[in-house]
Regions:
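A detector for short, charged/polar N-terminal pre-domain segments
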Residues: 1-10
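A basic, amphipathic helix-loop patch mediating RNA/tRNA/ribosome contacts
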Residues: 13-52
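Short, charged beta-turn/beta-strand-edge "cap" motif at the junction between a beta-strand
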Residues: 63-68
């Protein structure tokens, strides 16, 4: 599944983006999945829930991915 998420601000944090894309149900779920090293941003494992995502960034979680767009 590939999804685009739109954000109005300059950036969106990784945990928020995962929730907005529907890949996790809560912030707690996002935190656990990110800390487990199961999320990649632009092809690299990311373990910071507060990582700022900008338009063009691609996030993947176990075969699902989304792209941040303005």
């Amino acid at each position: 599944m590939e999804v685009e998420i739109r954000q109005e601000d300059e950036f969106i944090k990784l945990g928020q983006a995962l929730k907005k894309a529907g890949l996790v149900d809560s912030g707690v779920d996002a935190k656990m999945i990110i800390q487990d090293g199961r999320v990649t941003v632009n092809g690299e494992i990311e373990e910071r829930r507060g990582r700022k995502l900008y338009p063009g960034d691609v996030v993947s979680l176990e075969g699902d991915s989304f792209k941040v767009v303005k």
